[in-house]
Amino acid sequence: MSNLDVLLITPPSRIDVYQTLSNDYAAIEPPVWSMLIARYLTNLNLSVEILDAEAENFNHEQTAKKIADKNPRLAVFVIYGQQPSASTQCMPAGAKTCNKLNSITKGEIKTLVMGTHASALPKRTLE
């Protein structure tokens, strides 16, 4: 087990949401919610890192491998956006990365999905 308590993950949704437009026109939103949560958790003396797959330009497989390599006690998929419905369009990317992670690690890393979509539709999110 890693010494890392929590890994906050922004999954790579830009390609799924914007397709080829993402090559030239899609902005990368800073992981504001991850940074706020990280600060709170570090105040509780937990070790925390942020993996911003959007900024790293990772695909789902690369993101899942990076999470597996870090082997946190808890992997938190932070699926938010500044626009209220933004988390819904990013959910498929989060699901793809989660599924790849579970296939690599055989479900050994505990995961949590958070965001407005997951909060509003928890059962559908789990399906």
Annotate the PLM regions:
Residues 1, 12, 41-43:
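Intrinsic structural disorder
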Residues 2-4, 73:
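Nucleotide donor/acceptor-binding cores
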Residues 4-26:
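Short glycine-rich His-centered loop
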Residues 29:
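Secreted/periplasmic proteins that engage bacterial cell-wall peptidoglycan
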Residues 33, 37-44, 49-127:
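Glycine-rich beta-alpha loop elements in corrinoid/cobalamin-binding modules
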